UniProtKB/Swiss-Prot annotation:
Identification of the protein by name: Integration host factor subunit alpha
Subunit structure: Heterodimer of an alpha and a beta chain.
GO-annotated molecular function: DNA binding; structural constituent of chromatin
Sorted UniProt keywords: DNA recombination, DNA-binding, Transcription, Transcription regulation, Translation regulation
UniProt function note: This protein is one of the two subunits of integration host factor, a specific DNA-binding protein that functions in genetic recombination as well as in transcriptional and translational control.
Classification via InterPro entries: Hist_DNA-bd, Histone-like_DNA-bd_CS, IHF-like_DNA-bd_dom_sf, IHF_alpha
Organism: Agrobacterium fabrum (strain C58 / ATCC 33970)
Record Pfam families: Bac_DNA_binding (PF00216)
Gene Ontology annotations of biological process type: DNA recombination; positive regulation of metabolic process; regulation of DNA-templated transcription; regulation of translation
Family: Belongs to the bacterial histone-like protein family.
Keyword DNA-binding tagged: yes
This protein's GO CC annotations: cytosol
Stretches assigned to coiled coil: none
PANTHER family with a match to the protein in the record: DNA-BINDING PROTEIN HU (PTHR33175), INTEGRATION HOST FACTOR SUBUNIT ALPHA (PTHR33175:SF2)
Length: 112
């Protein structure tokens, strides 16, 4: 299910085509939005983009892990991790696209 990777340049090009800003302004807009999201997350704020997702930092306590090769117990230090939780709207869009893609593939196989 490997697909195309969307880059900052792709986002800027999309803004350029849809909004009508110059390519430079579009790239600056994309950078500014990404910077704002990163800064908010770094400050420990929750970033909620309605109908898309929520990003937040979560504290993970120290725990005991295991070396898979030796089976030896290894302490894993406490740390902060970023979590991404897709909204229900995004989940439904993904499911709908997946279902449509599967139906299309099934139709192509039947026509062969």
């Amino acid at each position: 299910m490997a697909g195309k990777t969307v880059t900052r340049a792709d986002l800027a090009e999309s803004v350029f085509r849809k909004v009508g800003l110059s390519r430079t302004e579009s790239a600056e807009l994309v950078e500014t939005i990404i910077d704002e999201i990163c800064n908010a997350i770094t400050r420990g704020e929750v970033v909620k983009l309605s109908s898309f997702a929520t990003f937040q930092i979560r504290e993970k306590n120290e725990r005991i892990g295991r070396n898979p090769k030796t089976g030896e117990e290894v302490p894993i230090s406490p740390r902060r991790v970023m979590t991404f939780k897709a909204s229900n709207v995004l989940k439904q869009r993904i499911l709908k696209a997946h279902t449509a893609r599967k139906a299309k593939q099934k139709g192509q196989k039947a026509g062969v």
